[in-house]
Swiss-Prot record:
Keywords of the record: Chloroplast, FAD, Flavoprotein, Lyase, Plastid, Transit peptide
Species of origin: Chlamydomonas reinhardtii (Chlamydomonas smithii)
Required cofactor(s): FAD
pH dependence per the entry: Optimum pH is 8.5 (with palmitate as substrate).
Name listed for the protein in its UniProt record: Fatty acid photodecarboxylase, chloroplastic
Any one Pfam family match given in the protein's UniProt record, by short name: GMC_oxred_C
TM helices/strands, residue ranges: none
Modulation of this protein's activity: Activated by blue light and repressed by red light.
Binding site for hexadecanoate: C392, R412, Y427, Q447
Its job: Catalyzes the decarboxylation of free fatty acids to n-alkanes or n-alkenes in response to blue light. Substrate preference is toward fatty acids with C17 or C18 chains. Saturated fatty acids are converted to alkanes, not alkenes. The decarboxylation is initiated through electron abstraction from the fatty acid by the photo-excited FAD.
One Gene Ontology CC term in the entry: chloroplast
MF-aspect GO terms: choline dehydrogenase activity; flavin adenine dinucleotide binding; lyase activity
Biotechnological exploitation: May be used in light-driven, bio-based production of hydrocarbons.
Entry binding sites for FAD: T55, A56, E76, M125, S129, N133, A134, T135, L136, G582
Length: 611
């Protein structure tokens, strides 16, 4: 629904002029401009300036603005997350490579991946990637956090922050919370192929796992993945944290505002932030959001943009900064290093003709790709059915070797045959099919993610221009163990697909195809088709000392060498958790907000007893 131009006072500072809120359709998304009438952010000073309006920022904005004496500003480059494609889980098919709500980023050319660039989906809206991800809610395992080896961040330390943040709809349940803002629930879409997949997985020896977030038992097994949804609607942090706080007079949100630099003054007592420079358009004026005395800048731009902006502001490896003519404020070699992700591959099989209609897309579209009114009605009146799913909320966590202490593989099961072995491109190809009036074929897809990959990449500078994307070296398979994991993953997926009762539905394997039979064949297939699981972390890692590559202190998330500057987003995670990273990002933000407000740490009340 389009909104006409109007003036509102939502979020206006008491005594300030009302904000103009003009809505217009841009690239299929409603763009909502929220800003002070006197200028993009006005002339007032802020206690907290949040750079980026993504997953962590929305949490912080809510929690910090709860103190009416603190003025909080959020700067977000993209639009709001109000678009229908964001709210409806099935709208994910329209969000990949979206011209407005995605950053459109790719890695540098990867020689080891047959000279391919890897597309990296990054949400560009209020809510960030929590508004464009698969809505899967996974914390990883207790062992993931214990492996960090950081005081205050063990599994015992973080567990109650996970529970505090959560509002689990199907509770009460052990290891889950019901009083938080982060809505979670069990999937609200069922397909006969889900049960057949479970039976086939059981036939290979996998156990059933009733709750992948219950740390009282191992992560292994097959089952439903809990989702970040509320009654079938996406529950990103924009909806669950930021929107409920928007009426507060001490909170200001500016969209279409791209941060270009953190302003840092160097003095005799050291370096300190004074504010943030930003632009409303690439070649337009630059504005400054100024800090009040004692104020802080909180970097919440994610694992790509946070290190990028730190380097542009003089915080990073001195050699890199000097190469691009940037004055060095704090020589931190770890900025942009330690990039980690979940590399993914696909196994897909086409259904026999009599079972073509079992795919999730066949429940939404007819043979000519016209949307079915029944699916729409089911969603509108029940908030259930194929529109209530991103397609991959059932699956398994598996160990590809008996020597492993915990799963290294996540299988995401999709009732439908992938159109391209690059899982992301399947959605783009589907868009072309829709234009031609052709449907997505029936069958199954198993997206296979190396969830505890060892390879590490980096974020660097291409230029000292904030509007030129950084150099992203994703560096998959720099550790050959990750390639071996995915080779074994394809073999395990084939084993499951060959079991009854799943086997009876399938006609032929389309990807990688039966001709890819040897390990060498599978390695070649994976190098040509591996894609991102969109779980980037680690590029401003927390730790005890910059000498060990840390960028921020694990004690308080402060950037080493700069006063008034902290990082609160997925880039601080020193090692990637074995599951989707949204839950861990919210956990970090909840804890950071409590730290900033001087609130006591929650005393751990649960003891994880298994990995």
């Amino acid at each position: 629904m389009m909104l006409g131009p109007k003036t509102v006072t939502r979020g206006a500072t008491k005594g300030a002029a009302p904000r103009s809120m003009a809505a217009r359709r841009v690239g299929g998304a409603r763009r909502l401009s929220v800003r002070a009438a006197a200028g993009p952010a006005g002339s007032e000073k802020f206690d907290y300036v949040l750079v980026g309006g993504g997953t962590a920022s929305c949490v912080l904005a809510n929690k910090l603005s709860a103190d009416g004496n603190k003025k909080v500003l959020v700067l977000e480059a993209g639009p709001t997350g109000d678009a229908m494609e964001v709210a409806v889980p099935a709208g994910i098919t329209r969000l990949f490579a979206h011209p407005v709500m995605d950053w459109g980023m790719s890695s540098l050319t990867q020689k080891q991946l047959v000279a391919r660039e890897i597309y990296l989906a990054r949400g560009r809206m209020l809510g960030g990637s929590s508004g464009s991800n698969a809505t899967l809610y996974h914390r990883g395992s207790a062992a993931d956090y214990d492996a960090w080896g950081l005081e205050g961040w063990s599994s015992k330390d973080v567990l109650d922050w996970f529970v505090k943040a959560e509002c689990y709809a199907d509770g009460p349940k052990p290891y889950h919370g019901t009083g938080g803002s982060m809505n979670t629930e069990q999937p609200r879409y069922e397909n006969v192929l889900h049960d057949e997949f479970f039976k086939a997985a059981a036939a290979t020896g996998l156990p059933a796992n009733p709750d992948f977030n219950d740390w009282s038992h191992p992560q292994d097994g097959f089952g439903e993945f809990q989702v970040s949804q509320k009654k079938g609607q996406r529950a990103d942090t924009y909806r669950t944290y930021l929107k409920p706080a928007m009426a507060r007079g001490n909170l200001k949100v500016v969209i279409g505002a791209r941060a270009t630099k953190v302003n840092i003054e160097k003095g005799s007592s050291g370096a300190r932030t004074t504010g943030v420079e930003y632009a409303m358009q690439q070649f337009g004026d630059r504005f400054t959001a100024e800090l009040a005395p004692g104020g802080e800048v909180l970097m919440c731009s994610g694992a790509v943009h946070t290190p990028h902006l730190l380097m542009l502001s003089g915080v990073g490896p001195a050699a890199t900064l000097k190469e691009h003519g940037i004055d060095v404020v704090s020589d931190l070699s770890g900025v942009g290093q330690n990039l980690q992700d979940h590399p993914a591959a696909v196994l897909a099989a086409r259904a026999k003709p009599e079972f073509e209609k079992l795919s999730v897309t066949s429940e939404v579209y007819d043979d000519k790709c016209n949307i079915k009114l029944g699916a729409v009605a089911q969603y509108l009146f029940q908030r259930r059915g194929p529109l209530a799913t991103t397609g991959c909320d059932h699956g398994a966590f598996v160990r590809t070797s008996s020597s492993l202490s915990q799963p290294d593989l996540q299988m995401r099961f999709v009732p439908g045959c992938a159109l391209d072995p690059d899982g992301v491109k399947s959605y783009i190809v589907f868009g072309e099919l829709k234009k031609q009036g052709r449907a997505w074929p029936g069958g199954i897809t198993l997206q296979l993610l190396a969830i505890r990959a060892k390879s590490k990449g980096s974020i660097g500078l291409k230029a000292a221009d904030p509007f030129i994307n950084p150099a992203i070296n994703i560096n998959y398979f720099s550790d050959p163990a990750d390639l071996a994991t995915l080779v074994n993953a394809v073999k395990m997926a084939r084993k499951i697909a060959a079991q009854e009762p799943l086997k009876k539905y399938l006609q032929e394997e389309t990807f990688p195809g039966e001709r890819a039979s040897s390990d060498k064949d599978l390695e070649e297939y994976i190098r040509r088709t591996v894609h991102s699981g969109n779980a980037l972390v680690g590029t401003a890692a927390m730790g005890a000392s910059p000498a060990a590559g840390a960028v921020v202190s694990s004690a308080d998330l402060k950037v080493f060498g700069v006063e008034g500057l902290r990082v609160v987003d997925a880039s601080v995670l020193p090692r990637i958790p074995g599951g989707q990273t949204g839950a861990a990002t919210v956990m970090v933000a909840e804890r950071a907000a409590a730290l900033l407000r001087g609130q006591a740490t929650i005393a751990p009340s649960r003891q994880p007893v298994a990995v």
